[in-house]
Amino acid sequence: MTKDKSILINNIYHMLSYAFQTLKQETYDDVAVESFDEMYNLLAAILAKGIGLQLKQGLYREYISHQEELTVMRGKINMPGTIKNKLLHKQVLTCDFDELSENNMLNQILKTTVMLLLRNGKVKAKYKDDLKKKMLYFSNVDSIEPTEIKWSLIRFQRNNQTYRMLVSICQLTIEGMLITTDAGNYRLASFVDEQRMCRLYEKFILEYYSRHYPELSVSASQIPWALDDGVGTMLPVMQTDIHLQRGNTVLIIDAKYYSHTTQVHFDKHTLHSNNLYQIFTYVKNRSYQFGEEDNTVSGMILYAKTEEEIQPDNVYQMHGSQISVKTLDLNLPFVEIAAQMDRIVESHFTGVIKAD
């Protein structure tokens, strides 16, 4: 089992399985127990399994608009086109019609992602063979330019919910790995992109606590500003990554996935000042919401541990609140990662019981 930027690749699977609960199903058990030496192989294995399951259910189809010149009417007659045909002495009708088709955006994204993985030399032959077999059922589906995919416009509904995890894996793959060469070809770069891994890291922590600690209220909630006059024009939204609460006890976790957990100035290591300012602001404004009630609101900056020699491990008492700065070592067997996360809860919420 190898590492990708100090994260065991199989641990990335565990992180994905919390972010996307579909991967917790028994049908993915063989992927969960396999040891991966490349991130590309993990992604290929997940997609091969997921696409296979989707094929058993049937590929999603939707109505696609077409315009064709036909000898018999289909759908609606397009008058301008038909008149033009008459003037050119063509005995055909221009027709507009909708056709139920597999050649839609969701299937195009799957095929495009698979084709990128098939062209990558680091993907093992067994995964490529599996993906190639799946692609035989995509003969009527077009590949598209990866850079032209408008992820924010994709909408899921009741009859295509099974695509949600697959498309998310595709987005993670394409956005995190895609580089265009001068020749206009695409190649896959290092998987770990800080910004995208940070989102996965946040989601993983949130979903882990949500699943295993039902006694706690777990959310990524917004905190209102403690305003004296109620005027908050142009103030930024205070959006927490992880907000844990039981009664009047609150822990706000700010999850950070950085290449460097500290900043260096004149050979002196210090904590990232913006991160400290942010968590302190969150804590004090959250505490204000309790009014005159007794409360304990704490904050924690939780960095993904790097290979740097100096790692933060600090607890501060600031203006009546505890602010801690810790690291989560993702380069360990997953059971030990879980133990680290459990200790965080146990140190802030007495008597809390973990659920399986």
Go through the PLM ranges and name each one.
Residues 1-186, 356:
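Terminal, charged accessory segments of proteins
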Residues 156-160, 186-205:
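A short, highly charged nucleic-acid-interacting micro-segment common to nuclease
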Residues 194-356:
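Catalytic core segments in nucleotide and nucleic-acid processing enzymes
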Residues 151, 189-190, 267:
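Short amphipathic alpha-helical segments at helix-loop
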Residues 61, 65, 69, 188, ...:
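Generic alpha-helical propensity signal that fires on short helical segments
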